[in-house]
């Protein structure tokens, strides 16, 4: 386990589920988990997609909440992005997963620090 990773499960019931999108967005934005679920359902209805798919959370983050996407250089890892923003809250996307970095520490249910990142959003 890396020093810049901390286990954190934002789900109110504590279950380990495949809901990284809701967990990460709720953690980063500090919106209630249930509020993020509702926003994702609305986004899914508008985009006619699953609430956890990329187009759905991209729409929520960029079009509804107004966060600007930033694209990674090809060799950047989650740890690299977290280290680049040690005083910020950042949502980081990897293939099939969305995670949150807060003050340089990855908050997630698994250590994805060495995974290659392709896109991120600075939240605060």
Question: What is the meaning of each model-derived region?
Answer:
Residues 1-66:
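Active-site nucleophile-adjacent alpha helix/oxyanion-hole segment immediately C-terminal to the catalytic cysteine
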Residues 44-96, 102-111, 116, 121:
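Conserved active-site-adjacent core of cysteine acyl-enzyme catalytic domains
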């Amino acid at each position: 386990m890396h020093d810049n990773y901390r286990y954190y499960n934002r789900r109110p019931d504590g279950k380990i589920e495949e809901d990284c999108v809701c967990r990460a967005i709720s953690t980063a934005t500090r919106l209630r988990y249930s509020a993020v679920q509702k926003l994702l359902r609305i986004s899914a209805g508008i985009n006619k997609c699953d609430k956890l798919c990329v187009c759905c959370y991209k729409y929520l983050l960029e079009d509804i909440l107004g966060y600007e996407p930033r694209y990674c250089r090809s060799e950047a890892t989650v740890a690299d992005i977290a280290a680049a923003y040690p005083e910020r809250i950042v949502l980081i996307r990897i293939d099939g997963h969305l995670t949150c970095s807060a003050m340089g520490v990855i908050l997630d249910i698994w250590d994805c620090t060495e995974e290659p990142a392709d896109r991120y959003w600075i939240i605060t």
